[in-house]
């Protein structure tokens, strides 16, 4: 049996399947456990619908069960809940539901209806400020109906260990189920909720679920590339490059020397604790984003590389050393998605890869960061030059998929270190937040995750999902997804900038904990980035208008 075979799901008892967590998955599971839910996701899909709220609430449990039947991944966990056994953070687990009572219990714990007037944004903020319980649970979903202000929404609250972009597909699947004739017929014909569930319930079987459960990126990589010694060596070379870049002196956003006991900026309190997990947001409209694309094409950059250039330059201007000190470079910490190397079906079909993050790296020398006599004030031409440099460094680092192969060994090392450090600090009685601060550098280097284009379908009817509304009768039920709001947990001393595009508009975010950072400083940096992008878009728009007059 090969190593890759040992990484696959296997039945260990009539009621339990498991597989090892590999690479980034394992690091995320240890990080989530020892760092109070770090990296957990909160993704809200806002919608409008002709379906009454009461009807949606009646259908919601059945819709969720229907989706679990097709996507058993919704029932995975990554921490053993067997109190008599040793702590196991090394495996993904899945147990079949065999009875109606078990199904109802899972639905009660997994699908939550919020109909007390709470808004989607309020719910996103609350979920971002508490970890998912019980520890190891991978998925929970909230249906927000009848908020006092704003639109209703479907909120996926998920662990990042076995999830990522897949959360959008899971939300889309629930939308489809809410409008499906099978679910609407079951609730109409069975007014009693338990009877309605019984009408669609089918006991789960391990042998049917195993081929559908998510595989690791490392397994899919090994299947596709069949790496030998040269490929493995190439992967470790990339890891060495990343470690070397991380050791270089870098600009960054400074954390507090000691975490703030009472952060100056929070979202209020939750259960008596400040909601310090902030997910700041700015948006560039579709027209300006289109202008940005034109400008990037003209100057040989890309929108993500230009955004990154603006982030790097803004951090340098807001947080850089004084002119009398040595100029630092910039360690580029970013994530990439394995879809650049793998076919689309890897992430969509049976046994999907749900956690497909690859850790990218690059380093800007002081001369590249502040070229020539420009200093920190690069101007538009300087920003595009920096964007081209960043894009080349990213392309050079991501010129091979074989870093994926090296992540298995690296994941083992990093997860062991996380556990050892956490145990030492626990024995020393170190405060949990102080421990997270001590484990982090004094400054957070420029960090960006580019999440691409949101591809969730816009309209849902009894006939399915599409990007254009087609009603057989004007009175037919329909639901329209029109906006997305994301949050999540960044519990360590880091600031992660993120970007995504939906219906042409570009959203930029900054995720961090205000116990560790000056929230006003981060807000100023984000606003400055948006301002620089706006200037580039305006310049491109003016150029286009001038050309049109010729």
From Swiss-Prot:
UniProt keywords, alphabetically: Acyltransferase, Transferase
Record organism: Pseudozyma antarctica (strain T-34) (Yeast)
Signals that turn on the gene: Expression is induced when cells are grown in cultures containing vegetable oil as the carbon source.
Role: Acyl-CoA-dependent acyltransferase; part of the gene cluster that mediates the biosynthesis of mannosylerythritol lipids (MELs), surface-active substances that enhance the availability of water-insoluble substrates.
EC number: 2.-.-.-
Reported biotechnological use: MELs not only have high potential as eco-friendly biosurfactants due to their excellent surface activity, but also have attracted considerable recent interest because of thei runique properties, including self-assembly, anti-tumor and cell differentiation induction activities, and moisturizing and hair-repairing properties.
Protein family: Belongs to the trichothecene O-acetyltransferase family.
Keyword Acyltransferase attached: yes
Keyword presence, Isomerase: no
Protein name according to UniProt: Acyl-CoA-dependent acyltransferase MAC2
């Amino acid at each position: 049996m090969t190593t890759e075979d040992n990484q696959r799901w296997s039945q260990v008892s009539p009621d339990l399947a498991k597989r090892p967590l590999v690479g980034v998955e394992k690091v995320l599971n240890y990080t989530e456990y020892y760092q109070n839910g770090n990296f957990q996701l909160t993704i809200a899909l806002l919608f409008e619908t002709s379906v009454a709220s009461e009807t949606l609430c009646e259908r919601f449990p059945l819709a969720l069960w229907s989706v679990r039947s097709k996507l058993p991944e919704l029932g995975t966990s990554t921490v053993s809940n067997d109190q008599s056994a040793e702590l196991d953070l090394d495996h993904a687990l899945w147990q079949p539901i065999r009875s109606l009572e078990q199904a109802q219990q899972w639905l009660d714990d997994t699908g939550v209806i919020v109909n007390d007037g709470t808004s989607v944004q309020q719910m996103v903020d609350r979920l971002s400020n508490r970890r998912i319980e019980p520890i190891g649970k991978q998925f929970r979903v909230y249906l927000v109906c009848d908020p006092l202000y704003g639109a209703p929404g479907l909120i996926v609250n998920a662990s990042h260990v076995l999830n990522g972009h897949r959360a959008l597909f899971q939300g889309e699947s629930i939308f489809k189920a809410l409008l499906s004739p099978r679910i609407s017929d079951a609730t109409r014909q069975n007014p009693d909720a338990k009877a309605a569930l019984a009408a669609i319930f089918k006991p789960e079987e391990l042998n049917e679920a195993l081929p559908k459960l998510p595989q690791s990126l490392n397994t899919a990589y090994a299947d596709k590339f069949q790496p030998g010694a040269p490929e493995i060596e190439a992967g470790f070379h990339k890891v060495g490059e990343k470690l070397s870049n991380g050791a270089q002196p870098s600009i960054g956003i400074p954390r507090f020397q000691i975490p703030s006991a009472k952060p100056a900026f929070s979202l209020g309190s939750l259960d008596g604790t400040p909601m310090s997990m902030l997910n700041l947001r700015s948006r560039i409209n579709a027209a300006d984003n289109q202008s940005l694309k034109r400008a990037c094409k003209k100057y040989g950059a890309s929108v993500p590389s230009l955004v990154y250039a603006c982030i790097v330059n803004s951090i340098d201007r807001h947080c850089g050393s004084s002119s009398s000190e040595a100029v630092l470079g910039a360690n580029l910490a970013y994530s990439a998605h394995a879809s650049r190397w793998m076919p689309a079906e890897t992430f969509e079909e049976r046994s999907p890869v749900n956690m497909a993050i690859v850790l990218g790296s690059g380093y800007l020398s002081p001369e590249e960061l502040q070229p020539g006599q420009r200093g920190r004030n690069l101007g538009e031409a300087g920003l595009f030059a920096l964007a081209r440099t960043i894009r080349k460094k990213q392309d050079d680092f991501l010129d091979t998929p074989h870093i994926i192969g090296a992540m298995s060994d690296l994941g083992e090392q990093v997860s062991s270190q996380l556990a050892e450090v956490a145990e030492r600090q626990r024995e020393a009685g170190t405060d949990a937040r102080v421990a997270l601060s001590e484990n982090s550098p004094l400054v957070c280097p420029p960090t960006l995750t580019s999440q691409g284009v949101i591809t969730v379908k816009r309209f849902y009817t009894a006939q399915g999902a599409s990007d254009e509304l087609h009603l057989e009768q004007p009175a037919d039920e329909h639901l329209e997804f029109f906006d997305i709001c994301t949050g999540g947990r960044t519990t360590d001393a880091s600031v992660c900038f993120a970007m995504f595009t939906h219906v042409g508009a570009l959203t930029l975010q900054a995720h961090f904990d205000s116990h560790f950072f000056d929230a006003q400083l981060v807000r100023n940096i984000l606003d400055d980035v948006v301002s620089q992008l706006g200037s580039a878009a305006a310049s491109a728009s003016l150029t286009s208008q001038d050309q049109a007059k010729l």
